[in-house]
Design a protein with these regions (language model features):
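C-terminal helical "tail/cap" subdomain of flavin- and related membrane-associated enzymes
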Residues: 325-403
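Glycine-rich FAD pyrophosphate-binding loop
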Residues: 36-59
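Conserved FAD-binding catalytic core of PHBH/FMO-like flavoproteins
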Residues: 74, 156-158, 165, 171-277
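N-terminal FAD cofactor-binding segment of flavoenzymes
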Residues: 58-98
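N-terminal Rossmann-like FAD-binding beta1-loop-alpha1 element of flavoenzymes
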Residues: 18-44
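FAD/FMN-dependent oxidoreductases across multiple families
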Residues: 246-333, 337-338
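Conserved N-terminal helical subregion
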Residues: 14-16, 86-185, 192-198
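Extreme N-terminal leader/targeting segments of oxidoreductases
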Residues: 1-19, 34-38
């Protein structure tokens, strides 16, 4: 990575800031950039800076389906054009079907008056472009930096850093991931469940072109998604019980290609090539609250959801937009941006929305796990009915888009 990023050593005592954001992933970097562009003095603390994105490197296995609301936010932050032009795979159609009942539902951008349903983009590309924009926006980057503790006071919060330094701010934003050490330090618990599944991921070449279509098939063991990449391949996310995931990861390449072809119902023809495979565990986790004194949670630190709807990062970016708007309104009204009543608006709105979405995704996962013939038949009837109810289907698509 280019070492001229001028990241500030955390040992230096910085002057008081409006906001300190901890966690430099996609959501944390977007939050720091959004708040800085809104005129708040902002610092971003991260233990490890991202590696430079390389257009000549293999497409990263971790990809995100960016919804239109996320694209709008990234465009407001001045980074979307760079992301799109670098390597973003647009999709205009989505086909979802049930392996057991055969019921299917289709979504089409043109029928909804949109150009695209979304874009499939590498996580590290989004993160890198956000980091590239931080310096010009005036964000102070403390990297490497780790927070060992913090103490909220009447008018500020003081962070104790691992190197012995301190930092003071009006508000601390924790965007430090699902395991969130800061959430634990704040004494905020979580609720949820372990799905006892792993998502197997890889990029594959197929016999037929994907035609800018996202495919998702609900199988007895979990959903399989084929997401269109900019280079013509598809990114797969195959949710499987843990033992089955281990078996699939251990298959030789041809056996894996054959099984994946069957699992995908050969909708794109034979699967002809694959990258090395990886897997990550799946769980549902929701923070019991999103705020503490001069402290808020953001992104995966607040909520982790099943990937079947592809909404995890989109929910985090909606957190960013809501927090920015909340703080801008508070400043315009002459209020303290770290005051409990100010943060309550953000926490109430986002926790309510995130909880409804997370429980909806969880319910969908449970419904498609049904194996009873009667329940499978009922599920099929419901899906076919939804596909015929254009207004309801359009509202579902708009919700997924973030509108």
């Amino acid at each position: 990575m280019n070492t001229s990023l001028q990241d500030m050593p955390s040992r230096r005592r910085a002057p008081a800031l409006d906001v300190a954001v901890v966690g430099g992933g996609m959501v944390g970097a977007a939050a720091a950039l959004a708040l800085a562009r809104a005129g708040f003095s902002t610092a971003l603390l991260e233990a490890r800076a991202p590696a430079a994105w390389d257009a000549n490197a293999e497409v990263d296995l971790r990809v995100v389906g960016l919804a239109p609301s996320s694209v709008i936010l990234l465009d407001e932050l001045g980074v979307w054009t760079s992301i799109r032009d670098a390597r973003a795979g647009p999709y205009s159609h989505m086909h979802v079907w049930d392996a057991e009942s055969g019921a299917a539902i289709d979504f089409d951008a043109a029928s909804e008056g949109r150009d695209r349903l979304g874009y499939i983009v590498e996580n590290n590309l989004v993160q890198w472009m956000l980091w590239q924009a931080l310096e010009a926006a005036g964000v102070r980057r403390l990297c490497p930096a780790e927070v060992e503790g913090f103490e909220a006071r009447e008018d500020r919060i003081q962070l104790e850093l691992a190197d012995g330094g301190t930092l003071t701010a009006g508000l601390l934003v924790a965007a430090d991931g699902a395991a969130s050490p800061l959430r634990q330090l704040a004494g905020i618990g979580t609720r949820g469940r372990d799905y006892a599944q792993r998502a197997v991921v890889a990029h594959v070449a197929t016999e037929r072109p994907h035609e800018d279509t996202a495919w998702q098939r609900f199988l007895p063991g979990g959903p399989l998604a084929l997401l269109p990449l900019a280079d013509g391949r598809s990114s797969i996310v195959w949710s499987l019980p843990e033992a089955e995931a281990r078996r699939v990861l251990a298959l030789d390449e041809q056996a894996f290609l054959d099984e994946l072809g069957v699992a995908s119902d050969f909708r794109l023809g034979r699967i002809v090539a694959t990258t090395p495979r990886a897997a990550f565990p799946l769980k549902l986790q929701l923070a019991e609250r999103y705020q503490a004194e001069r402290f808020v949670l953001l992104g995966d630190a607040a909520h982790a959801v099943h990937p079947l709807a592809g909404q995890g990062v989109n929910l985090g970016l909606r957190d960013v937009a809501e927090l920015r708007d909340t703080l801008v309104d508070a400043r315009a009204a002459g209020r303290d941006i770290g005051a409990a009543h100010v943060l309550r608006r953000y926490a109430r709105r986002r926790r309510s929305a995130d909880t409804l979405d997370a429980l909806g995704f969880d319910a969908l996962a449970r419904i498609y796990a049904w194996q009873s013939p009667a329940l499978v038949a009922a599920r099929g009837v419901g899906v076919r009915l939804l596909d015929r109810l254009a207004p309801l289907k359009r509202r579902l698509s708009e919700h997924a888009a973030g509108f």
